[in-house]
Amino acid sequence: MADICSILEYCKMQQSLTVPSLEQTEELKRVFRSLYETHTVFCFHGELGAGKTSIIKVLCQDLGVQGGMSSPSFSIVNEYDSLNKGLIYHFDLYRLREPSELIEIGWEDYLNSDSILFVEWPDKGGGFIPEDALHIFIDADHSSDLRTLTIKN
């Protein structure tokens, strides 16, 4: 799996990953475990219902988050305490009217915390998304539970 990090980090290429269902996520977890070593900001792109929140839940559970997790659609950010990585912040920027609203919620403090940040709808964040963030594009096949994730640096 270190090869994936090398490809993303040094070659600026992309990696595609197929998730057959939300019950079959071992490969997804394995890929992200290696990515946590070099990245803290993960931006999830996809249409409504593509599975952004569901995939983030799987990743949080793998990191040792216990208890309920939900999309922070109305609160913009949820904080989870993980057994393996400390605090994890889950952002849903869908309802932002202006990217500058991120300043009001302390975006810089979150970025400087060295915590893992999972961000849904990062396009709403404008220039506030760091250049070294990983971008995960989710393409969902709505006739099945299949999702194709494309990870780009």
Predicted regions mapped to residue ranges:
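Short phosphate-coordinating micro-motif centered on Lys-Gly-acidic
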Residues: D3-C11, Q15, Q61, S100-L102, ...
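P-loop (Walker A) phosphate-binding loop of NTP-binding proteins
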Residues: E47
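Short beta-strand-centered segment that lines the nucleotide-binding/catalytic pocket of NTP-utilizing
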Residues: V65-Y80
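Conserved lysine of the Walker
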Residues: K52
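Phosphate-binding P-loop
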Residues: R33-H39
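N-terminal pre-Walker A segment at the start of P-loop NTPase domains
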Residues: I7-V31
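Hydrophobic anchor at the beta1->P-loop junction of P-loop NTPases
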Residues: F42-F44
